[in-house]
Regions:
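Nucleic-acid nuclease catalytic cores
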Residues: 60, 65-78, 82-141, 150
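Generic detector of low-complexity/intrinsically disordered segments
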Residues: 130-136, 146, 160, 169-170
Length: 174
């Protein structure tokens, strides 16, 4: 089973590198550990793959590693997006003269087999505070999702990966 997980990670890394997601100042990390507070307790969220630089996390990728599994990696991806926002907010606070991070669009990808689904999750300071105190969020959390369902659309999938790349620039704290 560990070998299968490794192959899934390797495929994801190879695909992101092939499409130039890794740049001069960014790198692909596997199994990035992040966390946030929920109900006064630390919640861990380990992303399968992330695009990071020295300070920030820009993209999270969650893979469903069990072939034929009905598990949907969407909930895990959203938790990782919240944890990435929390990490980015903490790091931004220590950078100096920057205003606090109030909201950020976190791009994400889930992979079920070789089929990607692309996400844009808007995470806010308010959502983080509500989760920390177990209060129902006072504002709507927007999660946009676009996916491919047929294997014949591989060319289109690669075009989606290319089109998705500019979100990394926007995701860098806009």
């Amino acid at each position: 089973m560990q070998e299968e997980k490794s192959a899934v990670y390797d495929f994801g890394v190879a695909l992101l590198r092939l499409l130039n997601y890794e740049g001069d100042n960014t790198m692909i990390r596997q199994r990035k550990e992040m966390s946030f507070m929920m109900g006064g307790k630390k919640v861990d969220a380990e992303a399968d793959l992330t695009i990071v630089d020295d300070n920030y996390c820009y993209l999270v990728v969650q893979e469903n590693k069990r072939i034929g599994s009905p598990d949907d990696p969407k909930a895990q991806l959203i938790a990782e997006s919240i944890a990435a926002f929390h990490l980015n907010a903490i790091r931004r606070r220590y950078e100096g003269n920057l205003p606090p991070l109030e909201r950020q669009v976190i791009p994400g990808i889930t992979m079920v087999g070789t089929s990607p689904i692309f996400y844009r999750t808007t995470v806010t300071r308010s959502l983080l505070n509500n989760l920390s105190s177990l209060q129902y969020p006072s504002e709507e959390t927007v999660v946009l999702r676009v996916g491919m369902t047929t294997v014949e659309n591989r060319r289109i999938v690669l075009q989606c990966f290319e089109a998705f790349k500019p979100l990394l620039v926007c995701g860098r704290l806009c």
